Amino acid sequence: MTLDYPVPFHTPNLVWDSTIAIYLFLLGISSGAVQLAIAYKRSHKLENPSKNWIIRAAAVLGSVPTLIGLTLLIFHLARPWTFWKLMFNYQFNSVMSMGVMLFQVYMLFLVCWCAVIFKEDIMALIQRFIPKLGFVGKIINVLERLTGPVEVILFILAAVLGAYTGFLLSALISYPMLNNPVLPALFLASGTSSGIAATFLFILIAGKLKGDSHESHFIHKFEVPIMVTELGLLICFFVGLHFGGGQKVVALHNALSGFWGAVFWIGVFLIGIIIPLLANLAAKDSLKYNKNFIILVSIFDLIGVLCLRYFILYAGQLTVA
């Protein structure tokens, strides 16, 4: 059965709205930026990691988007003032509750990792403003000896966080398009892509690095493989719907037609994947490592990932099993 209502953001079966789409988008940026930074740090012998802009980007992009996303989630609750119950009363049969627990553990390890890296800066601030907290230095010294395990665990948690955004939607079993096993992998790949794009913007704009810097060359290694992976997972996602029969075929038709079809083909496929992919494959090195060119491609990438979150969330709720 095809749809007979034209309003894209207000459909009869809508459970989750744009707040959740933005929440998923922000978590993806955090996940991707942290994975990239840990990969960079472990593949380079950095004398002072706190001065490296990829590491700095992870400290900001890993924490700020996640906290903003959590704030949005809190105010999305029917009773926001009861959020503390969600934070400390875990329900192991609730995907949302498990996500909150994952967020807490992830933030704990991220804070520990950042504390070790920015130890000198933190201790300088403590000695200047709050000398009584000098004991924090001893705690950081202990964490410093555990840097290796902390980084490995944080990398795994970041990857799980990226995949969790897909698990969250796939838990809506009454929606054929969302109840799809490919979603976690797709959201992990697209989240990593958005983390890479956000890191590029951070190091080039805030860090004022050159387009042909060592950091830029390192990040470029991951762009094309991630985009190709994302494209492949999208194909698997739609092929699964096509051969799923029944309401899955209806869900596919409804999703790729009308307003949300345009969002996918223009926002996700063209702006988010094809243009950045061709730009990386076809551009000469003089253009590929041009600062303004990288910024433009990164913006396209972020637009595409945001459109994908909106498309999956809203188009996925158009059809009920």
How should each PLM-predicted stretch be described?
Residues 1-20, 49, 75-97, 166-186, ...:
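Membrane-interface interhelical loops and short amphipathic "cap" helices
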Residues 17-21, 48-63, 97-102, 144-152, ...:
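Alpha-helical transmembrane segments and their helix-start/interface "positive-inside/aromatic belt" motifs
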Residues 27-109:
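Membrane helical hairpin/interfacial module
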Residues 33, 37, 196, 200, ...:
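Transmembrane alpha-helical segments of multi-pass membrane transport proteins and ion-pumping complexes
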Residues 67-72, 153, 160-161, 305-320:
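Hydrophobic alpha-helical transmembrane segments of integral membrane proteins
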Residues 233, 301-308:
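Aromatic-anchored segments of alpha-helical transmembrane domains
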Residues 280-304:
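Interfacial loop-to-transmembrane junctions
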